[in-house]
Amino acid sequence: MDRVPFCCLLFVGLLNPLLSFPVTDTGEMSLQLPVLEENALRALEELERTALLQTLRQTVGTEAEGSLGQADPSAETPTPRGSLRKALTGQDSNTVLSRLLARTRKQRKQHGTAPECFWKYCI
C-alpha cells in the first residue's frame, strides 16, 4: 500500500514540468512568409533563365566539339543567385577533393631508417 501514494507522487512530479509549458493555440497563428515584390520575382526568374541558357549553350558547345573532356575546366558558370562559380569536370574535381583531404591529414616525420616503430612512437 505504501507504493501507491509513492507512485502517484512520482507521476505528478514527472508530469509537472510538462504542464508548466504554455500551450498556444496553433489554429489562430498562421505561418507568415516574407512576400517578395513582383519586380524581385521577375528579376530572379530572369536570372535563372539566363543561367540555364548559358549552361545549355556550354553543354551544346562541348558536345559539338566531340567530347566532354575538351571543355574548359575553369569556365565560370552563373548560379541562379547571381554569383559565379567555377565549373569543375572529371579529374579536376578529384584533385580538388584530394587537396582538401590532404590538408586535414597530419604530416608525420620520418625517423631515418629506424625500423623499430610502434604506432606513432619510434625508438
Curated annotation (Swiss-Prot):
GO biological-process terms attached to the record: blood vessel diameter maintenance; negative regulation of blood pressure; negative regulation of glomerular filtration; negative regulation of heart rate; negative regulation of insulin secretion; negative regulation of urine volume; positive regulation of angiogenesis; positive regulation of blood pressure
Gene Ontology cellular component list: extracellular space
UniProt cross-references to InterPro entries, sorted A to Z: Urotensin_II
Propeptide residues, chain positions: 21-104
Residue ranges the record marks as coiled coil: none
Annotated compartments: Secreted
Source domain of life: Eukaryota
Keyword field contains Methyltransferase: no
Main location: secreted
Assigned keywords, A-Z: Cleavage on pair of basic residues, Disulfide bond, Hormone, Secreted, Signal
Cysteine pairs bridged by disulfides in the record: 117-122
Tissues showing expression: Brain specific.
Signal sequence, start to end: 1-20
Region listing for Disordered, in residue ranges: 63-91
One Gene Ontology term of the molecular function aspect: hormone activity
Entry's family note: Belongs to the urotensin-2 family.
Protein task: Highly potent vasoconstrictor.
PANTHER family: UROTENSIN 2, UROTENSIN-2
Protein name: Urotensin-2
Gene: Uts2
